[in-house]
Amino acid sequence: MLKAQIQTGLQLLQRAAVSHMRPSSCTSMLMRMRVHLAPRALQSQRSLSSSEFSPLIADAILPKCSSCGVLLQNEDRSKPGFYLAPGSSRDFRKETDVVYEKHLASLEEADRDLLLNGAQGLQVSGQKETPKSQKQPANKVSCIRCRDSHYRSQFPLDQFAVAAVSDVMHSIPAYANLAYVVSATDFPMSINEDVFRHRSPREMQFVVTKNDLFFQKNSVASKYGLQFYQDYFWRMFNVPVENVHCVSGTVDWNTEKLFDSLRDNTYFIGCVNSGKSTLIQSLVHLAHKRRLALPNAKRDRALQKIDNQVISTQQEPKTRQALIKHNRALASAFKKQNGPGASYMPGFTRGNLPFELSRSVTIYDVPGFSSAQTAQLYDFLAPQAIKALHKGQKVYKAGTYKSHYETLKSGQVLTVGGLFFLQAPKNTMFQVKNLISHPHHIFKDMEKAMDVWRSPEIYPALKNVFVVPGTRNNAPTPLVKHIVPSFYGSIDLVLRYLGYVSLKPTGAKDPESGPLVVYLPKEVDAIIRQPITKYISRTLSGRDANGNVLRKENWVQKSVTEVKRYTGKTPFTSRLIPAVGEDASADEAEVMERCVEKIKGHAVAHAQISEETKYANWL
């Protein structure tokens, strides 16, 4: 039955094309078909083959939320996809006005005239009100969840479920092209290699987003950032360099090059909050600008008329700053109106949304994926905390060798919002730079940190230190102890989705000191990596202008700067070593060495780590 109705709809569309029906009439017809077919489409969506109908035609007939892509229905408000059919709405009426009108209407005409004393009375409830104008196009329909998220900041967690990799990949046709969107914030943690079980990485395009957090200028991102990403994907996954892009959807960096490289039926996949929807908004806006650049006599006449009015009225032209601000506001409004919905809440996109960039290229926004464990992180974080954390830190300001740092000393504990607790071993000292969008705090020891975290009511001055609650369901939030593999020099402690903390040991090395220990909530995933700044920006090389090796105390004054190339000869990342059960109370160095030897077949004693063996214990 549903199939026959859709075929009828397709025939109507063909007749409309033959008879040159006006676009507005065609849109109205589609909307009537959407409302009529919505309940049956929702019940029978799995029975339809994606290859039987054009995706754009099917999207026009089967009602979808224009913001998140879920199939719409108007029968059950408690189920996903519920929406209010577009139509005229009445102005808001105060309760006091309603009561006043009721009593005014009950009066006789003479008493009413005496009360009003010649003034015009309020409109009585029985009179017809003027409906509000339709503010959004008829084909832009959003579900209740998206409307509440955008306009009321309401985020029911049960409606922001995060999909698994297998579910997302099975929803994509086998013939589709893939663009894997990777976030620079936690690079390379947002590369989920489970995707490569379904498709070869050589067949994909890799788009690294959010590079405005790493680079101050697009020219630097295009020079150093793109070079590093191309090196990394070639060395790790054998991806051709032309399939790697360094972009920013927020500020429209390098989107034109990406636009020109896209093929038809390209699906944008990636982890949650990797910037897919924001990037597609930028591409949709770019397509709009290219269409406007085409010759159009009617538009040119309208612009000429506006210019003539400005000249005749002698209006002062806008300043350059005002014009830039005005154009940015117009671009932002267009992206929100015509692109997919973008939100800092993970799991916002719930269905595959098509967007036609040109007559020959259609792209799709796809729901983000994540593992079941790491997705639980958002179950106990407040929406405002999630928004602040995903804002990101400017690496070119806070993450370079010239940036300000804090000092973490022996026995002290560093935390960023309770997302982790990093304890410095005895007789050690570290320079710390926080690249997570939340203030850090240093406690004198682990006991004090746990006391404040789990009893915040006793320390009201520190109530804003934590975003992760210390207790859940009247029980302490469990932490898992992890050991950081031995390293020599600086490293980055990277947290999935959130950013990283730069750690640089200082002072003479004590052979009796143990490895770093970090305590994580079970929902938080972390790794260590080589400092990414040495591959994407100019850093100290440790040599003078003549190529002579310098002592470390002379680096800042005499060292030249350089940008290193990633060769793949050394490991770029390493996972942490969990210490659970009996290992939780054992010597950290022994636990680490035993684990490394079990996995790799050999290990280097922590006290013997040097420049030559600094990656020997990385896993």
Curated annotation (Swiss-Prot):
Residues 1-55 form a transit peptide. Its main location: mitochondrion. GO terms for molecular function: GTP binding. Coiled coil: none annotated. Keywords: Mitochondrion, Transit peptide. Residues 162-372 form the CP-type G domain. One of its GO terms (cellular component) is mitochondrion. It is found in: Mitochondrion. Gene3D superfamilies: P-loop containing nucleotide triphosphate hydrolases (3.40.50.300). Belongs to the TRAFAC class YlqF/YawG GTPase family. GEP3 subfamily. May be involved in the mitochondrial lipid metabolism. PANTHER family: GENETIC INTERACTOR OF PROHIBITINS 3, MITOCHONDRIAL. This is Genetic interactor of prohibitins 3, mitochondrial. It comes from Clavispora lusitaniae (strain ATCC 42720). The lineage of its organism: Eukaryota, Fungi, Dikarya, Ascomycota, Saccharomycotina. The gene is GEP3.
